[in-house]
Design a protein with these regions (language model features):
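Contiguous, well-folded functional domains in the mature portion of proteins
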Residues: 1-274
């Protein structure tokens, strides 16, 4: 944090939120993202390096053949080898990632309005509940429908390409370190995709796919449009390179039973009490 930038109305007094620098970072990172979709961004050597780390799960039968990867983004957003099959009734995780429980009752109307910028449905989630997945670079970076429903809103909100957190002084390690926050604050600044569904069992739910840091790319499947009837487990979209979060918002009368900081896989069962 910089003292000179305090009291300027920035989300955090850091240069990445200063408008001129934020615009340049956004332009630079978009250009970088375009390059990461070219063949020059990918080499066989990168695949062999990734194979040595079991967290990528490349030596399992989970993912498609690497012959389909012709760019870094092809690899990063790699498909599953077989279509996702959801054997559960009820709600399932829309993605891989670490699950975090977040009470929306501590989030102001203004913050939700920022997160769902311009949505006519934003007020129905105030006082409700939210859950939040943080995706790691090793995770599967496509996201799927957590339940069946009808799309009533689907769009992408362009944001700035900031760091998705703050830099703090770690007195124990005697160095500055990056601290990602689990609140809905910084997500309201990032590029994000907003999908709101009307569901039979859970009322209206919002799925917010947040592209955090650097490229911040959220790509919806072309078939996902307002009025589309979605099946549980259906692929909704993907993240290209950059940090990735998924948030789900529920109406006020829904109760969730979740285990905080729990690693999950896409399609894994969630406990939602009607």
């Amino acid at each position: 944090p910089l003292e000179a930038l305090k009291d300027r109305g920035y989300w955090y007094p850091s240069l990445q939120y200063e408008p001129t620098i934020a615009r340049w970072l956004t332009e630079y990172n978009k250009a970088w993202g375009e390059w990461l979709s070219t063949s020059n961004s990918w080499q066989e050597a990168y695949y062999q390096i990734a194979r040595t780390d079991s967290r990528f799960e490349l030596d399992t039968d989970r993912y498609e053949s690497p012959e389909h990867w012709h760019s870094w983004n092809d690899f990063f957003a790699r498909r599953l080898r077989t279509p996702l099959v959801v054997p559960h009734q009820g709600m399932v995780s829309p993605c891989d990632g670490v699950l975090m429980d977040m009470p929306v009752k501590t989030t102001s109307v203004e913050e939700l309005s920022d997160l769902l910028t311009g949505s006519p449905y934003k007020d129905v989630f105030v006082g409700g509940k939210a859950i939040h997945w943080v995706l790691d670079v090793f995770d599967y970076h496509r996201f799927h429908a957590p339940c069946a429903g009808t799309v009533i809103e689907c769009r992408t909100i362009e944001g700035i390409h900031a760091g998705g957190g703050v830099i703090i002084w770690d007195a124990e390690q005697h160095r500055y370190r990056y601290a990602q926050l689990a609140a809905t604050g910084f997500q309201s600044l990032e590029t994000r995709g907003v999908l709101i569904m009307d569901t039979l069992d859970y009322g209206r739910i919002a799925l917010v796919a947040v592209g955090i840091q650097q490229v911040s790319s959220v790509v919806w499947n072309e078939a996902i449009q307002v009025g589309t009837k979605i099946e549980q487990g259906q692929e909704l979209g993907l993240f290209q390179f950059g940090g990735s979060d998924i948030l789900m918002l529920f109406e006020t009368d829904r109760e969730l039973t979740t285990e905080n900081n729990k690693p999950m896989k896409v399609g894994e069962k969630l406990t939602i009490n009607n």
